[in-house]
């Protein structure tokens, strides 16, 4: 395996590295380059946490939803219908519901994808087993 194919497999950046130019006190321009980060490198650095977005959103959504309930309850207890605080409470309430719904949707999609992958894997195993015993 060549070095270039290894870099492609590891997700090395395919475009040129970004360049930043700085001036130092002697009126010279210093050029520094910084590497680009690919998705594969990001997954390696975070341990694959970027694929668990729905798990991160749930606690935040619950806090926003409860805050929305409290703010809306306080606003309507003072009979301030249509005031800024009641609108803010309703926005928080709807944002919390939206985040919870999107988290549930992401979870469902992920479960469906896992089921499809599992089914494909079982199919490949059965075909391979038939080839071995045929």
From Swiss-Prot:
Disordered: annotated segments: 1-23
Q: What is its main location?
A: membrane
| Leader sequence segment | none
Expression by tissue, per the entry, reads: Expressed in dorsal root ganglia. Expressed in neurons as well as nerve fiber bundles connecting ganglia and fibers innervating muscle layer of the gastric body, jejunum, and proximal colon. Expressed in arterial endothelial cells and neurons of the central nervous system and peripheral nervous system (at protein level). Expressed strongly in lung, weakly in brain, heart and muscle. Expressed in enteric neurons and vascular tissue in the muscularis propria of the gastrointestinal tract.
Q: What happens when the gene is disrupted?
A: Mice die at a mid- or late-gestational period. Show embryonic lethality due to impaired differentiation of arterial endothelium and defects of vascular morphogenesis. Conditional knockout in endothelial cells show similar vascular defects to those observed in global null mice. Conditional knockout mice lacking Tmem100 in dorsal root ganglia (DRG) primary sensory neurons, exhibit normal mechanical sensitivity but reduced acute nocifensive behaviors induced by mustard oil, consistent with a reduction in inflammatory mechanical hyperalgesia and TRPA1- but not TRPV1-mediated pain.
**Compartments where located:** Cell membrane; Membrane; Perikaryon; Cytoplasm, Perinuclear region
Query: Which UniProt keyword terms apply here?
Result: Cell membrane, Cytoplasm, Developmental protein, Differentiation, Endoplasmic reticulum, Membrane, Phosphoprotein, Transmembrane, Transmembrane helix
Q: Which residues cross the membrane?
A: 56-76, 84-104
Q: How does it sit in the membrane?
A: Multi-pass membrane protein
Pfam annotation, one family: TMEM100
Domain of life assignment = Eukaryota
Which residues are annotated as modified residue Phosphoserine in the UniProt record? 15, 121
Q: Which GO terms describe its biological process?
A: angiogenesis; arterial endothelial cell differentiation; BMP signaling pathway; cellular response to BMP stimulus; endocardial cushion development; epithelial to mesenchymal transition involved in endocardial cushion formation; in utero embryonic development; Notch signaling pathway
Q: Which GO terms describe its cellular component?
A: endoplasmic reticulum; perikaryon; perinuclear region of cytoplasm; plasma membrane
Q: How does it assemble?
A: Interacts (via C-terminus) with TRPA1 and TRPV1. Interacts with TASOR.
Q: Please identify the protein, giving its name as recorded.
A: Transmembrane protein 100
**Protein's organism:** Mus musculus
Show the taxonomic lineage: Eukaryota, Metazoa, Chordata, Craniata, Vertebrata
Q: Which gene encodes it?
A: Tmem100
């Amino acid at each position: 395996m060549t070095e270039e194919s290894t870099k492609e497999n590891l997700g090395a950046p395919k475009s040129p590295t970004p360049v930043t130019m700085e001036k130092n006190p002697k009126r010279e321009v210093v050029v520094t380059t910084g590497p680009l980060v690919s998705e594969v490198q990001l997954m390696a650095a975070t341990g694959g946490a970027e694929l668990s977005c729905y798990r991160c959103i749930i606690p935040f959504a619950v806090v926003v939803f409860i805050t929305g309930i409290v703010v809306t309850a306080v606003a309507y207890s003072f009979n301030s219908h249509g005031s800024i605080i009641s609108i803010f409470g309703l926005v928080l309430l709807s944002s919390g519901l939206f985040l919870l719904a999107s988290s549930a949707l992401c979870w469902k999609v992920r479960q469906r994808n896992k089921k499809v992958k599992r089914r494909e894997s079982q199919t490949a195993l059965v075909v391979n087993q038939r080839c071995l015993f045929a």
